[in-house]
Amino acid sequence: AGYNAWWSCLIPAEVISAIGLPLPMFFQWDDIEFGIRARANGFATATLPNAGVWHADFHWKDRDDWSRYFSVRNSLITAALHSDFDVKSLSIMLGREITQFAVSMQYGLAHTALKGIEDFLSGPSILEDGGRTVLGEIRELRSRHPETVKHPASAIPDVRSSGIADA
């Protein structure tokens, strides 16, 4: 893969001396960017044999949450730093994704992705506090969209019987 997730990562001091610390991209794509940068500077990565951490696959998780902002923004940062960054292809892909969110009435998710793109375009100053400020901004932004509010099952009002099952 060319990188290792943080859970399987041991970083020798010489790597930090040569390439610096990971970028403060809380919390997605930071390990990928660091691994790509390490490999580009001659440091191979390897997963420790039999090491592993189980967590739900990212595709199983709820895509409509605040973390989507960091995924969009940080993937764009990584692409800009370590790829040919085909602006046309990225624009088409992101345009389709945001259109899909809007057509699906996932307005909060569309707004979240757009904020990630806008902040990427604003430049590196967005990384200054490691994400602390923007996390609060994203949560507030998303709270303006009713479909992003999670409700516990206990909040569902009692439903009157239609009488069908009572017969």
Language-model features: where?
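Short, flexible, basic/aromatic active-site loop/helix in glycosyltransferases
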Residues: A1
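Hydrophobic alpha-helix feature that most strongly marks membrane-spanning transmembrane helices
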Residues: L21, R37-F43, F58, A80, ...
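Donor nucleotide-sugar recognition loop
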Residues: N4-S8, A18-I36, G42-L48
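Active-site donor/metal-binding and catalytic loop motifs
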Residues: L48-D64
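Terminal low-complexity segments of carbohydrate-biosynthetic enzymes
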Residues: R73-A167
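A conserved hydrophobic position in a structured secondary element of the catalytic/binding core
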Residues: I11
